[in-house]
Amino acid sequence: PRTYYAAMATGGVWKSVDGGVSWAPIFDDQPTTSIGAIAVAPSDPNVVYVGSGEANIRGNVAPGLGIFKSTDAGKTWAHVWKQTGQIGTMVVHPRNADIAFAAVLGHAFGPNPERGVYRTTDGGKTWQQVLKKDADTGASDVALDPSNPLVVFAGLWQARRQPWGLTSGGPGSGLYVSRDGGDTWTQLTGHGLPDGPWGQVGVAVRRSRGRRVYALAEA
């Protein structure tokens, strides 16, 4: 509980082993310093996934180079998915460190087909795009139900960055759920959720009570 990792927008990955009193850089030998997400496997704290490319898409946002993985708590890294763009969230299965999801926002300044939610079931050797809307819509968040990891929630965000501004929102944005581990997805509407169009979407599942889900929607 005294070990922490921190992702920096342009400063790589840092680690503390004394509860945050001191920090050391552990990613400086890698080809990118723009970090969007860190996920530590609950079943094996030596397994750490890093999604590069921060998803706060300001005018001078730095693109990432895909996904990196460590199996020795950050001492060494493998470049397991090579794509440019932004990754905002990663999450690891609570009992299987080989299963992980990535919310890929993609390139901030234009349409690109790699946007969406990706899943690996073999420890990062291969990644499958399991949720995709269109080339203008990326994934802004992904969350697992810790008590039932077959239940996965994801937020999609239709967004386009220009040097002078940001276009956020449109028919592509929405909140989705999968009840079979990411194989199939259903968009959630109504029942208290605001009418569209939406912008950026965030989602979280309460750890102690998986049926309680929190969603934050720009609407």
Residue ranges and their predicted role:
Residues 1-219:
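Beta-propeller blade termini and top-face loops
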